[in-house]
Amino acid sequence: MLWDPNEVVDSRVVSSSEWWIDLKDYKELEAKAGVYLFANAKYDIKYIGTAGARRMVEEVKCAIDRKKSKGATKVRALYTNSTEKAQSLEKYLIAKYNPVNNQT
């Protein structure tokens, strides 16, 4: 399913990465709690993951190492105020987008 830009309006999201960045540049993400999304060039969501406080870059790297980025070329982060809000947002987004790499 293609990314809906209105998702950043969710009350759990306090900020987000400026836009989608190349997956290879994931270290540019801020080290905050939140949800990260992998997508292809057409913004079809391939994977959604969560990161606790100060763990965004580490969690994205771990997901890449676990091959969760298969078919993806872009990454975006939606930052939250807490791990709990990140987990709640992740659950909602996975249910909505049903990403292929979350099923493996």
Q: Where do the PLM segments sit?
A:
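GIY-YIG nuclease catalytic motif and its immediate N-terminal context
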Residues: 1-56, 84-92
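A short, exposed loop/beta-hairpin motif centered on an aromatic-Gly-Thr core
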Residues: 45-48, 73-81
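Basic, amphipathic alpha-helical patches used to engage nucleic acids or provide basic targeting signals
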Residues: 55-67
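Acidic, divalent-metal-binding catalytic cores of TOPRIM
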Residues: 95
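Coupling/hinge elements of helicase-like and P-loop NTPase modules
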Residues: 99-104
